[in-house]
């Protein structure tokens, strides 16, 4: 992947004006940044104002904001996690941000709900008091993983918005992502 240009970051003014108007009474918001500078911590806090809960995909948190080949590193402003309800990350992102994929590594990030996607091995849900492996869902046919993470995140917050517990939401998200990547 290659970054050709870097746009302006989302600002607190964006989050408190036109974005707030567009969101209205929305309770759950999915944030999927391309680069770590797309949503500064202050903007995430503004997006989480009131009763909104944020799910942030970690892919943007580990990507450097520079033109050229996509590069990743571990530096992240710890305040970026302060306003998150859910952090969704894959194994590579977990190793970069948390130093590992074990529940204790993930809990150290301080996010109430963390969902670690494990590709064909399922997922791992980690909360302050609980960790549960989400079983893999068999996939038939040729697999195209394009959009699997975004689909997982959308299904997770959709289930949570309907009142599902985190583990139920993770199971639903895992099932939907498996269905969407199969071309059978």
Report the location of each language-model feature.
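Conserved phosphate-binding/catalytic region of the ribokinase-like
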Residues: 71-78, 104-184
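Residues that form generic nucleotide/phosphate-binding pockets
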Residues: 22, 97, 180
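Active-site donor-binding loop signature of nucleotide-sugar glycosyltransferases
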Residues: 5, 89, 136-139
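Short, well-ordered alpha-helix to beta-strand connector turns
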Residues: 25-27, 51, 83-85, 111-112
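A short acidic, often aromatic-flanked loop/helix-cap motif at beta-alpha or helix-coil junctions
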Residues: 8-10, 62-64, 139-141
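Conserved beta-alpha-beta core of the PfkB/ribokinase-like small-molecule kinase fold
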Residues: 32-105, 121-122
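Conserved N-terminal subdomain of the carbohydrate kinase-like
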Residues: 1-38, 42-53
């Amino acid at each position: 992947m290659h970054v050709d240009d870097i746009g302006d970051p989302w600002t607190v003014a964006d989050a408190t004006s036109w974005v707030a108007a567009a969101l209205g009474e929305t309770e759950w918001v999915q944030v999927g940044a391309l680069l770590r500078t797309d949503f500064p911590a202050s903007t995430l806090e503004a997006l989480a104002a009131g009763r909104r809960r944020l799910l942030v995909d970690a892919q943007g948190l580990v990507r450097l904001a520079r033109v050229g080949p996509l590069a990743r590193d571990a530096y992240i402003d710890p305040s970026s996690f302060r306003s998150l309800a859910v952090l969704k990350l894959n194994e590579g992102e977990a190793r970069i941000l948390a130093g590992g994929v074990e529940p204790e590594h993930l809990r150290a990030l301080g996010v109430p709900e963390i969902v670690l996607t494990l590709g064909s091995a399922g997922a791992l849900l980690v909360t302050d008091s609980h960790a549960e492996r989400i079983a893999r869902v068999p996939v038939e046919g040729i697999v195209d993983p394009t959009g699997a993470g975004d689909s997982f995140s959308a299904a997770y917050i959709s289930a949570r918005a309907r009142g599902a517990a985190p583990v139920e939401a993770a199971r639903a998200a895992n099932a939907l992502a498996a269905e969407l990547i199969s071309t059978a």
